[in-house]
Every structure is written in C-alpha cells, then in structure tokens.
Amino acid sequence: YTLRYLDKLEDEIKSRYKGELVDTIYIGGGTPSSLSLLELRRLFDIIKIFKLKDKYEATIECNIEDICIDKLKLFKDNNINRLSIGVESFDKDNLSYLSKSTLIL
C-alpha cells in the first residue's frame, strides 16, 4: 500500500506545485524512517519535483530503532542535512509500557 500512497502523493504534488523555490523540506509525521529503503528511494524521487533554494534545510524524522547505515547513506545521498530523532521517554518503565526498547546512553 505504501508505494501506491507514494504514487498518489506524487500526483497530488504535480497537480498543485507551481514551481516556487522551497527553502525547507520536512519529512515527518508517522516516523518516515520506518519506510523500507525502496519506499524511501521512491519518496526522495518525488521530492526532486521541488525546486530548492541554494541554501535549504532538509529534515527527516527518525526513530532510533529504524536507523541503519544504509538509511543514513540514503539520507546523505539525498541531501538530508538534519535528522530529528524523537525520544519517547528516558524512563525504563514508560518505555516498557509503550512497548519501546530501551536505549542506553
């Protein structure tokens, strides 16, 4: 379903985007880092529709459990220059209740 959603997202952007210069790309909401490499590549292809200013910020929200070397390389290759890594809690009991793994810092 995700690839079909991305196809519809591309259709929507193409129908509404008028070519304005963009200074911020924010990929977030629903933890996009949980997408597969194939899905992320498709998303980055869609984002290339936008015309970016010379200086821009490109952010992607990440769940620490979803980050791997391949995804970090993909982010870098697609000019993501900021990661937003959310923290649900530093309390072990809260993490257990939320069914999240514990991150030792």
Please name every model-derived segment.
Residues 1-105:
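Conserved non-cysteine loop/helix-boundary elements of the Radical SAM core domain that shape
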